[in-house]
Amino acid sequence: MKTDITMLIIHQEVDETGSPDDLDVLVQVEQVRNALTLHGYSVQVLPVTLNLHRLADVIQQTRPLLVFNLVESLDGKDRLLYLPPAILEAYHVPFTGSGSDPLYRTTGKLLAKEAMQMAGVDTPPWFTAPLRDQCDIIQGTYILK
């Protein structure tokens, strides 16, 4: 048995009245917990919020062998999902999923578009609101979403 070896599962805090999409992470948590328990690991589950001190404290107290990162957003904002990996990286804790840098770059639409353009990947023309007066691509009729 490996019960002295802790695995930590982190996920975003979910309201019990949330949408099926939001609640799905709890199904994932149970599946991972069951698999790890079956293999003899001690498992701790931590809902992560914007109080990242709590995550840091749990990491320091439990010293997990590995963290299963199931965080999909923080405080309902996908753009913040790079924060838990950044904490894990700072404490040199191995974890599943992408690191903070790729998550930061890919969850910001404008940052991702700029990176694709710099790499020579064609993207549709775009502009930000402050540049609209200096931009010639906005002439014509559009459907905005």
Regions found by a protein language model. Give the residues of each.
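Active-site nucleotide/adenylate-binding loops and adjacent lid/helix of ATP-dependent enzymes
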Residues: 2-12, 18, 30, 60, ...
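Conserved dinucleotide-binding and phosphotransfer motif residues
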Residues: 39, 91, 119
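Glycine-rich, highly charged phosphate/nucleotide-binding loops
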Residues: 44-63, 78
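Short catalytic helix/loop segments, enriched in acidic residues and glycine
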Residues: 21-37
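A short, GP-enriched loop/loop-strand-helix hinge that lies immediately N-terminal to
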Residues: 15-19, 63-107, 122-125
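A generic structural motif
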Residues: 36-44
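General small-molecule cofactor/ligand-binding pocket signal
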Residues: 44-47, 96, 127
